């Protein structure tokens, strides 16, 4: 093998374990893995998949969490909150995530890797009972909190 050939092979991900950065960019949490016992581990994997790249700024990830915090407060304070109201709030959050994804590629990568939009869509599943809708929405809120925590733990930007 000639000198140039070996160089181009490495660029294609051959030898030396391939291009791990591309593997991280392609990592996406599967919805079935986000459970009440595994959501913290999944959040850590998402943030690790963004290591070595520009993470979101702390301000950006906190603004995303602020959207979710309002829902979290409602869910914890109001036992009579209807499934329909929860679904409406999740739809609004989903729309705001889509908007932020359109504005900034780093947000789009984060939302995609964390599978946030599909998670929010799953709350709107017509087959769920009122109790299941509330439980799934609470799990979403906890998952978002875990993402923010690991973002900080792994050195999220303060810019």
Regions inferred by a protein language model and the residue ranges of each:
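Small/polar/charged residue-enriched interaction surfaces, especially the RNA/DNA-contacting tracks
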Residues: 1-159
């Amino acid at each position: 093998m000639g000198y140039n050939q070996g160089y181009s092979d490495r660029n294609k991900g051959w030898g030396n374990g391939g291009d791990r950065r591309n593997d991280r960019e392609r990592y996406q949490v599967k919805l079935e893995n986000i459970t009440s016992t595994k959501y913290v581990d999944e959040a850590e994997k998402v943030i690790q998949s963004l290591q070595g790249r520009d993470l979101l700024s702390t301000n950006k990830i906190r603004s995303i969490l602020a959207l979710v915090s309002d829902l979290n407060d409602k869910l914890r304070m109001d036992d009579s909150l209807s499934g329909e109201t929860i679904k409406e709030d999740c739809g609004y959050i989903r729309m705001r995530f889509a908007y932020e994804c359109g504005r900034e590629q780093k947000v789009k990568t984060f939302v995609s890797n964390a599978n946030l939009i599909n998670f929010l869509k799953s709350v709107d599943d017509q087959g769920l009972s009122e109790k299941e809708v509330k439980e799934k929405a609470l799990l979403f809120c906890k998952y978002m909190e875990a993402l923010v925590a690991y973002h900080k733990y792994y050195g999220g930007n303060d810019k």
